[in-house]
Structure formats: structure tokens, C-alpha cells
Amino acid sequence: WIAQPVRTAFNHRHSFNLEGGDNTLRYKLYFGINQAPGVMKGTGVDTKSGSIDLRYRTNKLLVSNQLSIDFTVGDRTSPYGTFQTYTMLNPYYRIYDENGAISKVLDNHVYSTDGYVSYIGGYSTPTMNPMYNIQFHQKDQNKQFQVRNSFRAEYTPIESLRISADITLTKTEEDLEQFKPSSHTDFEGLAVEDRGSYNWTHNKGT
């Protein structure tokens, strides 16, 4: 069971740089992609970044400006559930039923004697199959978009005097979206109208 929700994950990082100019004006362009899948299936972080860096220099004046943009998408929760759930399952439980479909219930923990129903081992609820939920669309995703602009100016009227000014502006937007369908095993035993969940949160910052 513990091998089912995990995978071998490799981090992929790619970048592109272009720079040039002369003694007066210099420029630098950057674009990068960082894909970091998680060990749990269906999790990971995907980041795309870009920046433009400009520098202008004369005898007494230096002006620079850097604009950077970052966009990150993170899938926080595996559709397989938590790893701890799998460590608690008995190895003899069968993932699939006799028809090859993923079983919803692994063990009811009940037996009947003379018309009376008893629970085995103190269990009062059935053990659900966490892999049953991978058949349905679900989401626990975080998206973040950030723009940052840094401006700096330096003026040196004489060799022993330097005047400088810095301005940095940052804008961030973040979305968190969480969805579980009504067929998810988390809602087993609940009334139909209480099944399923959806949550969306949007944050802005400067």
C-alpha cells in the first residue's frame, strides 16, 4: 500500500540569459522555469520567472532599473490522500474488486450472529479505500503572481560626495482553490446536501 501514492520525483530547472550593451547602456534579460514535482503523486510546484535589467551610466550619473515577474502554481494535496493513511492499512486489503474496479470500502469491520450486528476490533465506521478518490476531479491549488520593480539612481557631483535614491514597488496576487466532489470518501455517511466542498480565497498585496 505505501508504494501506491508515491513516485520518484526529479526537479527540472531551465533558464535563458541574454545580456549586452556598451559602457553607457547595459541590458540583461532572464527567463527561467523551475518544475519541482512532489514525492506524493499529483503534488508539486511549477515556477516561471522573468526579468529585465537596464543600467545607464555617464561620468557622474548611474541609473538602473530591474523589473521581475514570478508566477508560481503549487498543487498542495495529492488526490491519493495522505501518506499516513496508507501506512495504517492492512497489507491484505485489496485495491480492486473482482471486476477490476477500485473498491470503495476495504473493510466494514462488522459481522452478524443470530441477527445481531457487531463491530470488530472496536471499529464503528468502515475503512475506506483512499485510492477510490483518484477517479474524481479534485483540487487543492495555490497560485501566486508577483511583479517587482526596483529603481536606483546615483549621482556623484564630486569624488567625495555620492547622492543615491532607491525605490522598490511590489505587487502580489494569490489565489487558493480547494474542491472535493460529493463522491469523495470524506463525505461518506453524510446527507446528500452536505456532501462536497469548494473554497476560493483571493489575496492582494503591495
Residue ranges of predicted features:
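Short alpha-helical segments and helix-capping/turn motifs at coil-helix boundaries
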Residues: 11-14, 47-51, 147-152, 156
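Short strand-turn segments of transmembrane beta-barrel domains in outer membranes
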Residues: 1-17, 27-43
